[in-house]
Amino acid sequence: MLLHLCSVKNLYQNRFLGLAAMASPSRNSQSRRRCKEPLRYSYNPDQFHNIDIRNGAHDAITIPRSTSDTDLVTSDSRSTLMVSSSYYSIGHSQDLVIHWDIKEEVDAGDWIGMYLIGEVSSENFLDYKNRGVNGSHRGQIIWKIDASSYFVESETKICFKYYHGVSGALRATTPSVTVKNSAAPIFKGIGSEETAQSQGSRRLISFSLSDFQAMGLKKGMFFNPDPYLKISIQPGKHSIFPALPHHGQERRSTIIGNTVNPIWQAEHFSFVSLPTDVLEIEVKDKFAKSRPIIKRFLGKLSMPVQRLLERHAIGDRVVSYTLGRRLPTDHVSGQLQFRFEITSSIHADDEEISLSAEPESSAETQDSIMNSMVGNSNGEPSGDATEFCKDAKPESPSEGNGVNSSENQNQEHAGPVEEAAGAMEARDGSNVSEAPEEPGELQDPEQHDTQPTLSAEEVAEGLPLDEDSPSSLLPEENTALGSKVEEETVPENGAREEEMQKGKDEEEEEEDVSTLEQGEPGLELRVSVRKKSRPCSLPVSELETVIASACGDAETPRTHYIRIHTLLHSMPSAQRGSTTEEEDGLEEESTLKESSEKDGLSEVDTIAADPQSMEDGESDGATLCMAPSDCSGGHFSSLSKGIGAGQDGEAHPSTGSESDSSPQQGADHSCEGCDASCCSPSCYSTSCYSSSCYSSSCYSSSCYNGNNRFASHTRFSSVDSAKISESTVFSSQEDEEEENSAFESVPDSVQSPELDPESTNGAGPWQDELAAPGGNAARSTEGLESPMAGPSNRREGECPILHNSQPISQLPSLRPEHHHYPTIDEPLPPNWEARIDSHGRVFYVDHINRTTTWQRPSMAPTPDGMIRSGSVHQMEQLNRRYQNIQRTMATERAEEDSGNQNSEQIPDGGGGGGGGSDSEAESSQSSLDLRREGSLSPVNSQKVTLLLQSPAVKFITNPEFFTVLHANYSAYRVFTSSTCLKHMILKVRRDARNFERYQHNRDLVNFINMFADTRLELPRGWEIKTDHQGKSFFVDHNSRATTFIDPRIPLQNGRLPNHLTHRQHLQRLRSYSAGEASEVSRNRGASLLARPGHSLIAAIRSQHQHESLPLAYNDKIVAFLRQPNIFEMLQERQPSLARNHTLREKIHYIRTEGNHGLDKLSCDADLVILLSLFEEEIMSYVPLQSAFHPGYSFSPRCSPCSSPQNSPGLQRASARAPSPYRRDFEAKLRNFYRKLEAKGFGQGPGKIKLIIRRDHLLEGTFNQVMAYSRKELQRNKLYITFVGEEGLDYSGPSREFFFLLSQELFNPYYGLFEYSANDTYTVQISPMSAFVENYLEWFRFSGRILGLALIHQYLLDAFFTRPFYKGLLKLPCDLSDLEYLDEEFHQSLQWMKDNNITDILDLTFTVNEEVFGQVTERELKSGGANTQVTEKNKKEYIERMVKWRVERGVVQQTEALLRGFYEVVDSRLVSVFDARELELVIAGTAEIDLNDWRNNTEYRGGYHDGHLVIRWFWAAVERFNNEQRLRLLQFVTGTSSVPYEGFAALRGSNGLRRFCIEKWGKITSLPRAHTCFNRLDLPPYPSYSMLYEKLLTAVEETSTFGLE
């Protein structure tokens, strides 16, 4: 009887664990392993200690600012979301009241979500409510928070977010709310050795799926979908189910065209899985035709295999489920039906990968724990459980090398293991088995190079790693099964590799494509992908083993599961259930149609298909590294809490996971196939997977494993596990919306990257052992305490590393990406705030200086006016644009301007605002990094500081890193060929703390070591050693650390190597304009000595005055004179050169003959005098082309357009006769300025004197400029004076004035403009600007500023979208302009234009407009409601729709801006330009760095950097002059602007998106551009000449960007 009772309890426990965790959405990260894939952080507010919320006084809740500021002075008119209380005690407090006051567009589908603090994905809400159907801008809702697995700690910080239903934009966020749960248990930790599993007899089931058909799928906007199925096997949701080789099986069905009721009749798919696995079926639209991409997601189904087995056992072969959705706003409809057949009996698994080192007594101890817990009536862990936590620790922890440890353990336990294996069926599930350990789970990152890897064949066939492994562990059917797994695996990898080689379009980025490492066998890759830390692995096979023990040997699957139901229903807790049979029937019905909103839960991995969370590595992920609290004890304790709570309702008033506001409280606990007694809240109210198990976990940021894969583990809490386990088939969206119920979705999948100091007590030896040479992970569990309330003696941020986890030396940085909402509890500096734009991106607002930035500000106080002077990079970039405009004009104006240039002074930044050296910027960045460490403890801060001072970090983050990279040809080729390496370098350069994540990556180590100079001595405190395999590693005695990276790499002293010094000098000197650089030689005294501390050139000169220059002086002269535009440069300072043909011949002779010619003419007086004027330029000049491409050689006889330094207006790229439509921008520009001068614009004699205060720049300018009349603005000269600063305005102060003013006026601070949807550096008029007080006058003022800058020839540091420039020119917008505003809308109209719509669409000339929440119908033309759209009139319909969409909400603003603009500029003069040319006139032309462009270009469709067509392409681009390159950039990206970070920071519609070239089209087609994706579709032209002509034609003779 006792034996039977133990068996029943074990069965109950395992059934509870299995159902609650395995029924889950698939773990997408298992198959989605692209190098650029973003993984998400999830922050816990407890990690930030800058604010003492627990003990400090409760301040008044501050209102967070929203996306728009509706008033220039006050802040009363911004969107707000407020909560009635900042503290909430579960079961004791009154319900929260959420108030909203939304100024932006609202919708009846808007919803409010409850999130953990720091959660950045809208999908990961804990709960959500619809705001109601009234569509009002103000309202409130009552919110009751119940005890659930989200609140297992004593305090949990949450916030509420208001989302717009249509666009998904975040409207407002509440301050943080602290939820107190007095009933939260406190658990003791378990030693890490107790995580060992009993292998037991895992049961792999072979089954087949066939007869698929779907009914009622969602129809597209204009067309039926082309559905296909993507079916995969994923491990159970919780980490107790390890990733095994059979996971990741994936099959895709054929595409059924143009139907909402597809039937896949001949499709038959076979899979092998465990009962705990999840079968995930996703229905997607292939988008096979030329149709607009609206949303390809049609629905998904995540079903536990065990659920299918139960249906099979009761005779159901054909099953039907309702498709689910991912977000509350997803529109999913339809059902999926298929046949499920078991093709083989349940048989033992051969998996030998997971660790298994559990002592024999472990399982028996668990039984005793179960006994004590079932009998325990309160929510606290029983004494036995506590004793188990203490006693079950091993006496002598194994330490040292992972493989050696494995061998020792195998030898030590060989005997007991064989006994256990032999009696495995007779021990009531208490199995003890010893499996060979997998090195991938044991070895540290540093050991990856030295430890043997387990090959796929060994895994598949179950071969032991060493000879001492007991052979009796391998069942007889292992070989057969292994071969089966191998057969399943090989085609999978092959198919994926083919997909990678083919290249995928943007719509395929949602697919699960594994990035395969070149040169590695596919099979080995499949296994290595699964080599992930499973630190807290409960026995995955206990469920099956216990069931087998209880049920006997000879059993069919049907009787097997019927027996399970019988046992479960006989459990004491099941009989205590209060649910009636009738209620259960209702629950089962509800389960079958339960809301597909929880299908957001179907994406187990939190890396969902959200485009903004992909790319760029902008969003960082986290990999778990489980702390000592073993899940075994945690599960039992949590289970005890659940059982106890069910018995003691008074002690725990709210134990259910359901919300009281939901009508279906009981439905969340229904268990399909079980009677009511099994579904009581006492059974599922609190889960064994509650996050209390993780209270002492630590998480390393995206542990990068040895195969360049991100390894992430997903942790989910209990309630949704239990709910999903009941059924993953959810009710229809309509039901959910009618009920307006709050449900609990996928919780925060990855907990805090830092430990809560109050939840961790631990030992100190860990951090000392982490840095042991060779990277051997400490195996000790001594001194590890369980998380308990009270003071902690573990240093913050440290993490006990288990025997199978990867060690880290410190925690990752918490730098938030700018497109995510920041952690609210991390304070911003005073007078700063974070706002979210209409695209969900976060930018930061400085209310003192009234500027915005994408970079999170630091806490250091900055003197007023310094920040507003702008970044040095931006000012330098603006100066480069000035330089190019001046060069453009130099041909015509060289002589007339030469006299005026002599009187100009070098602008000193208008009093120092624009100055500063790079060294200052670096120290500022360094201090910013240190300040960001404020939330860390002193000890951890010191460790992070040491890491940031390591040679590798200094090298990668140095501003001159790319200069050194270009000079190292072999490293440069490695860098350009490895996408993963680029990703790692970019992440480290953005935040140096990311280096901790990648420091052991083999590719990164080898890459950095390519720069090491082994001839040098090691730095002081460093030592080189050799491990037992002969591999060298380096010991840093200063920081007590070891590394494989050679410290003898360049840039350690902040300076370039000598042979690269001149290039740095050149780049910085050239960042000023040609006119200013010339002042260095002519005005050596006054202007430079006036304020040397703030002069950029003075700073550069002082910084490099001692550095030696490697080239001989004669070589520098020759290189300088070989510039293609040298004659124009020489004439700027010596105008007589134009008439001195003899001197010109001498220069040409030197250009042709080189040093030999210079030696002959070295005594020529005229030549020496001329060269003496350019002494500084010669000394600092180096030909960039030969420096970056050593293989290229300069030929003075070749086309002068081949240099990347060629500027517009100097050369022609083609000798052919210009076509009628060809634009001559240089001629237009010169003619425009000549006519302005002739008509007296800006010529005087009067002056517009603007006296500007730097601290009131915008207001002062507004008042003064708006006071002048139209005539005065047109005729008078402009004169700028900064208050309190001496100096005359010879263009310097005016230049800085427009620079600073444009940075303020055109940024989103005042709500007049907003960042465009395409990127984060172009702006457009904001429809929300109508809420700004006096907004029309502000737009009129903006127009006047644009006009003043134009006629006085100053540039603005602002880039606008193409529709904006068209609006300035009063040109009508066409369909291509819609791409900037609404990509999906544009593609839908494009599809209408390209296809015959006869009998397909039922449209009229009307459009639905939502005004203040009310939807009204508006006619596009008179009688439009009665006019059908046909094939004949669709062109008119498209034109009217485009006009409506472009002008919607900004008509008045545009008219006001045009009024101000044409008050200053004559419209007839401006009309000579088109929209792209006007952008160049207003914002200037920047010199394009071809090397940076090429290095940050991606290729698809078979192209690569060495492809012949690509080589021709870059040769053609190099042949272009700078204007043509700018036109090409405009053609592909939509703007000629390049972020000041370079091409690596180019952005697309949903985040970072580099310039991309894809193989597309026939050779007769012109290249095609996709501006939203920065992609150029380039046909594989057969010759260079054809490519050049086609490319030039596309760039210069097309008026639209997306040429079809």
Swiss-Prot record:
A Pfam entry, by short name: HECT
Q: Which InterPro entries match?
A: C2_dom, C2_domain_sf, C2_HECW, E3_ubiq-protein_ligase, HECT_dom, Hect_E3_ubiquitin_ligase, HECW1_helix, HECW_N
Transmembrane segment boundaries: none
- Keyword Transferase included in the entry's annotation: yes
Regarding tissue, the record states: Predominantly expressed in neurons of the spinal cord.
Biased composition, Acidic residues: where in the chain?
435-444, 458-469, 580-589
Highest taxon of the source? Eukaryota
Show the ranges annotated as biased composition (Basic and acidic residues): 387-396, 494-505, 590-601
Q: What does this protein do?
A: E3 ubiquitin-protein ligase that mediates ubiquitination and subsequent degradation of DVL1.
Task: Write the protein's name.
Answer: E3 ubiquitin-protein ligase HECW1
| Protein source organism | Mus musculus (Mouse)
Encoding gene (name): Hecw1
